[in-house]
């Protein structure tokens, strides 16, 4: 059974509803966490990886591609993010992607990175959800999670980020307003592998 909790309104607002998954919110949230991790002075709840479907856990895979090593490729159909490596290999992560009406595709570049980023909801989101805070400082309860990689095109901020999440049960679902969300542990890992200037390719969705 799924429900919309008060916590979901406050902390899951950055993602909102997914048509195929009424709310990526579960009754027993605590089951998705196991202990804590302290990172750069912030203590956050560690993901219980046993709750994450094996296909969406970080893993080294064979991946046929024609991208330069270090390129990030996001498969919005399968909810995978690939970090391309040499010899047709990649590190694959499970991700949450944009819900219907908020999907996008094309090329971008990481032009900014932040650890424990603050969150400023965009004006269009505030219009849809006027109860949201105008700004939320970075920390363990911030919807952007432990890291954010900011996506630009031709020097312009697209408004989309690759970021962590306080809701690990949403990985593998179409849940966001266009951002790419990852487990906090995974986005910390990717953050260390993807420097400023990294090319990002978001594949077009196939109906």
Where on the chain are the PLM-derived regions?
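N-terminal pre-domains immediately preceding structured catalytic cores
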Residues: 2-207
């Amino acid at each position: 059974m799924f429900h919309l909790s008060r916590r979901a309104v406050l902390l899951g607002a950055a993602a909102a509803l997914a048509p195929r998954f009424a709310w990526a919110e579960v009754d027993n949230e605590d089951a998705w966490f196991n202990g804590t991790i302290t990172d750069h002075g912030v203590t956050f709840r560690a993901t219980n990886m046993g709750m994450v479907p094996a296909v969406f856990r970080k893993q080294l895979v064979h991946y046929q591609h024609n991208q330069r090593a270090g390129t990030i490729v996001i498969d919005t159909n399968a909810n995978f993010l690939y970090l391309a490596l040499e010899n047709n290999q990649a590190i694959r992560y499970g991700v949450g992607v944009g819900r219907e009406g908020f999907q996008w595709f094309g090329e971008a570049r990481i032009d900014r990175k932040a650890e424990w980023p603050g969150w400023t909801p965009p004006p269009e989101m505030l219009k849809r959800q006027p109860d949201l805070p105008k700004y939320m400082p970075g920390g363990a309860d911030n919807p952007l999670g432990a890291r954010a990689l900011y996506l630009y095109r031709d020097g312009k901020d697209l408004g989309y980020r690759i970021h962590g999440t306080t809701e690990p049960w949403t990985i593998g679902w179409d849940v966001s307003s266009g951002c790419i969300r990852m487990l906090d542990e995974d986005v910390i890992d990717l953050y260390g592998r993807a420097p400023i200037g990294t090319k990002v390719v978001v594949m077009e969705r196939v109906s």
